[in-house]
Amino acid sequence: MSAIVTPAALGALMSGTAPHAVLDLRERAAYERGHIYWTTSLPRRLLETRLPGLVTARSTPIVLIDEDGSLSELARPTLAAMGYTDVGVLAGGLGAWRAENRSTVQGLNVPSKVFGERALHEWKTPQVSCPDLAKRIAGGDDMVIVDSRTPEEYHRGCIPGAWSMPGGELVLRIGELVKRPDQTIIVHCGGRTRSYIGAESLRRMGLPNPIIALENGTMGWQLAGLELERGAERWAPPPSSRGRAVAAEVAKRIVKSDGLRGVTAAQVRDMQGRRAVENLYVFDVRTTEEYAAGHPAGAVWAPGGQAVQAIDDYLAVRGAQIVFACDDGSRAALSTAWYKRLGFPNIAYLEGGLPAWTAAGGDVESGHPVPAVWGLDAARAGVATVAPGALGDAVVVSVDPSDVYLRAHVPGAAWICRSRLETRIGGVAPDRARAVVVTCADGAQSTLAAATLGRLGYSSVRVLAGGVRAWQGAGQPVETGATRLADEADDIVLKPYERGRAAMEAYLRWEEALDMEGRSPHALLPGTSATR
């Protein structure tokens, strides 16, 4: 692939079947405002942490995108140093793409939202409006309401009386709540997608119960003037032996009807041995507690509902081999079925799950592994540190995420997004001989940033040892708020419900009208960062 990729060449690459990755290096708010459909949001500052897991094969063709190509050119040497051998830059960036009247889309996780709307229309998912559900709750209707989002989202605010049951757990656990065939099951989320996918997962079970999705979820509930329940703790009950047997039977039926492929533990281990030359994702779709207790070595935690809700957060190479794993194969098979309907060509589930993996001699890891940061050790060897305490007249620069900076930073610290450090540092420290101290929460991102400043010619750069956490631990004072932003805080995007009524209304209009290419006649409100 050419080092400079024209818009036409990128369009041809993305419409083909050869494995490739297209990485948008801008920050999340800029990506939300407009991006090329099916590209992966990977802010430049996260390359060292996330890229090895997103693109495992170093020979994969990779195209870097930003607004005008300048950020991509800054990032290209990093990828080369990491061993990626086929890296191109979109000539002229998104500006050139748009100049040729090529389309862009708004929003985050757009492929998943498109799929949710497709599910609604193709399978005609039954729906209930928020006012109607409120009336049914007030009238004491016999029904079970489940929230298919993450436990954290559920706890922040759910439909009154709802149980937490993330989408990937519905088929396994719904029988623990529903005791009669005439009980209505209501599935809700924050908006639309996860309600529809969750309801359709239950409908595939063949239950006699009425299964209905709540139209517009918790946002619709609030827009209707209704109050959410805050701090609920009705967690999904553990699955019984009967529930497991039912889920296994449903999975067996879906495997046959959908023509799904199972792979053995030995086959997965062979794939893992080739992951440096053939892209591979192994996703464990169970709960966080189950994953932490023990999972196949190398598997990434991707709970089933979120793996469908946020596809582009988990993978960057659509042609890669994807393997789903769980404890007995049932939840993994259901995730595989959804990805097949999404059009992924190389998908499979681990037959027999974790027990089969361990029986075959596969290594098991526990906890949630902290991703290695490429280049961090080398950067540490080349930069000096300073202990918490008096920093003298040094210029203090924070490269934390902006929301972390707002919560606590060293007094006087200027905030710069690390993705744009080279182009912003001159406004904060124009004298390259001046002492500079770089900070972040724990010292990792600041170490990488300090190494960059050294390459730029800053001769007296140090890193705050242990980061702001160590600073606070030493009893030093901190500042809060946007005291000295030296860059646009576009790295954090608030949810529509965090932005207010107008943002929620705009979001729901936008999502409902999405076409199969991620386009909508309705616009989202401009993305907002944590500073607003």
Name what the model sees in each region.
Residues M1-A21, L25-V144, S148-Y281, V285-V395, ...:
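Rhodanese-like catalytic fold shared by cysteine-dependent sulfurtransferases
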